[in-house]
């Protein structure tokens, strides 16, 4: 297989993948499905509380359904609390985070652009995080998500200059003597909001209840297009457990594979979109029952539990973190949560995700040296070219040798005509005699393909590149080139690469396909993020120089056809 043919196959494979990404996505909103409910996880044995018994049965009026129904009516303004830090502005009541703005991430680069709103009360596409308490016993008083009341009169909390932490206290008290104190803690330069619930029972009877934590969203209908980078990324719910690891479900087919009913210890749940995500992270040592469902056209993922039986005179507590923010790799790593790095969704496949994480690590190290994400991309491509040079050299040498012997192969084809068996036998004899490996040009490309595909997703998925400039006219590496300069350069690089690569023996159809390939790629790249096109231009430009050098070094003169018939072994 000569190098031009290998390039043709690889190029059309790339076209097929990109077209598949464009056309395989559904434009319709998710179809509501019946609500599925299930019991919370078995009660936990926690110091200060007696383990309770939770039946493995369907729970009427499960928390997810109740939470959605309750939120259908707007929360009174008197109950709302605003919390502002250096990175977040939250609107919440005791049990819900109703609105969340990411103050360091404007929606556009225009001056005065409002910040990204991750959680929202938009009636068309509401998105909230909910935490409340429920009970198997309908006679047991519980706060739900609405029962918590703010302690004190302050309703606007602001993290002051020099202050590193801010606490917002809530409380719920039952006539039976049960009290739940809820404390929300926000910190400087952190997107994780810490929830701590302390349950105490001063009554005369045991109290049974369990905590639930929910993400509830009506997904936005995305414009599925190569011109819309948001549609490239995974949009849906994900969860993690120590046995089955990372799992996910897209919004567009939320319940296509059934509901989720699973007890998980030390896991987490999340909803992802391009560059941003929300996640509930319960305590590592507590077990919860994870549920995936749809209620009233809204997609929910929920962790129910742990459940507690709190005896008179006893108390217990449970904690969780709510992440509301960007997919910043360094900050996610600081949370020290197993598997949380997978929310930066380079791939659903573990091997590709590991390759993507490694590539981003290298990209980040280069960025620390050069201080610019555009130049970091250039540096990463140079490093990859150096590392992969032995494979590329093998590919070029094999292709050059195949091209040199094309006159001999053409002679064999002419000699044996339609007798393909004799032609193949003679060609194998030629390969063996001249020590030609027909797969030598193909294997290196197959080895490199996972790296190139992983790098594509690194450049698309990394929020660090969002609105990051390169230089000159490129002021946002995640937006398309406004003047199409990089796509035009990419077309020129591909065209010169074709001209530099001899293609003896290629049939007319392949030649026509090759002639159109730079134009096809140019049109597609015109609407891709400029950071991705920058990668293709640098990679192609270095490849062109490498091709020129290798052709000069290993090209040689074509081996002329023989004057005597080549011997063919008889069977």
Curated annotation (Swiss-Prot):
Note the InterPro entries from the entry.
Membr_insert_YidC, Membr_insert_YidC_N, YidC/ALB3/OXA1/COX18, YidC/Oxa/ALB_C, YidC_ALB_C, YidC_periplasmic_sf
Alphabetically, the GO molecular function entries are: membrane insertase activity
One Pfam entry for this protein is YidC_periplas
- Identify one Gene Ontology CC term for this UniProt entry: plasma membrane
Mode of membrane association: Multi-pass membrane protein
The principal localisation class reads membrane
Q: Where in the cell is it found?
A: Cell inner membrane
- Its transmembrane ranges are 4-24, 369-389, 440-460, 483-503, 518-538
Does the record carry Transmembrane helix as a key word?
A: yes
Its subunit composition reads: Interacts with the Sec translocase complex via SecD. Specifically interacts with transmembrane segments of nascent integral membrane proteins during membrane integration.
For this entry, the protein name equals Membrane protein insertase YidC
What is the native source organism of this protein? Stenotrophomonas maltophilia (strain R551-3)
């Amino acid at each position: 297989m000569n190098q031009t043919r290998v390039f043709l196959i690889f190029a059309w494979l790339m076209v097929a993948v990109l077209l598949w990404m464009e056309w395989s996505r559904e434009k319709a909103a998710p179809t509501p499905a019946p609500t599925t409910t299930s019991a919370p996880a078995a009660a936990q044995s926690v110091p200060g509380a007696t383990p309770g018994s939770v039946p493995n049965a369907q729970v009427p009026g499960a928390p997810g359904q109740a939470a959605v129904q309750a939120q259908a009516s707007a929360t009174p303004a008197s109950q709302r609390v605003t919390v502002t830090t250096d990175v977040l502005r939250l609107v919440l009541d005791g049990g819900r985070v109703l609105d969340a703005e990411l103050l360091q991430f404007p929606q556009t680069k225009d001056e005065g652009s409002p910040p990204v709103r991750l959680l929202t009360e938009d009636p068309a596409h509401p998105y909230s995080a909910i935490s409340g308490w429920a009970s198997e016993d309908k006679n047991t008083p519980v706060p739900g998500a609405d029962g918590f009341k703010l302690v004190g009169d302050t309703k606007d909390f602001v993290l002051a200059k020099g202050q590193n932490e801010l606490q917002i206290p809530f409380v719920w008290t039952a006539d039976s003597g049960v009290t739940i104190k809820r404390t929300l803690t926000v910190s400087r330069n952190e997107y994780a909001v810490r929830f701590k619930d302390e349950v105490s029972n001063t009554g005369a009877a045991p109290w049974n209840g369990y905590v639930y934590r929910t993400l509830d969203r009506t997904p936005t209908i995305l414009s599925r297009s190569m011109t819309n980078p948001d549609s490239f990324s995974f949009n849906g719910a994900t969860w993690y457990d120590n046995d089955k690891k990372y799992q996910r479900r897209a919004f567009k087919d939320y319940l296509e594979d059934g509901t989720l009913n699973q007890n998980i210890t030390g896991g987490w749940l999340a909803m992802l979109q391009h560059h941003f995500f929300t996640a509930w992270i319960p305590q590592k040592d507590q077990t919860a029952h994870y549920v995936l469902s749809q209620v009233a056209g809204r997609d929910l993922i929920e962790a129910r539990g742990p459940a507690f039986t709190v005896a008179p005179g006893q108390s217990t507590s449970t904690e969780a973190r709510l992440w509301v923010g960007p997919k910043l790799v360094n900050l996610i790593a600081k949370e020290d949560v197993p598997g949380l790095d997978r929310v930066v969704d380079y791939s659903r496949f573990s091997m590709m995700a590991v390759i993507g994480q490694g590539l981003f690590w290298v990209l980040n190290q280069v960025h620390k040296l050069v201080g610019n994400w555009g130049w970091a991309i250039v540096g990463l491509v140079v490093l990859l070219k150096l590392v992969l040079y032995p494979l590329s050299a093998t590919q070029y040498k094999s292709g050059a040798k195949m091209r040199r012997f094309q006159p001999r192969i053409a002679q064999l084809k002419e000699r044996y005509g339609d007798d393909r068996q004799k032609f193949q036998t003679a060609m194998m004899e030629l390969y063996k005699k001249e020590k030609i490996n027909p797969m030598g040009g193909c294997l290196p490309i197959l080895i490199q393909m996972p790296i190139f595909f992983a790098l594509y997703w690194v450049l698309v998925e990394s929020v660090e590149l969002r609105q990051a400039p390169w230089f000159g006219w490129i002021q946002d590496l995640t937006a398309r080139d406004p003047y199409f300069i990089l796509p035009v350069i990419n077309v020129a690089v591909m065209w010169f690469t074709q001209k530099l690569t001899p293609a003896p023996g290629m049939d007319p159809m392949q030649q026509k396909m090759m002639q159109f390939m730079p134009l096809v790629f140019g049109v597609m790249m015109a609407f891709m993020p400029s950071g991705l096109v920058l990668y293709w231009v640098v990679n192609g430009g270095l490849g062109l120089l490498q091709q020129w050098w290798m052709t000069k070094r290993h090209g040689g003169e074509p081996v002329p056809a023989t004057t005597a018939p080549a011997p063919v072994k008889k069977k």
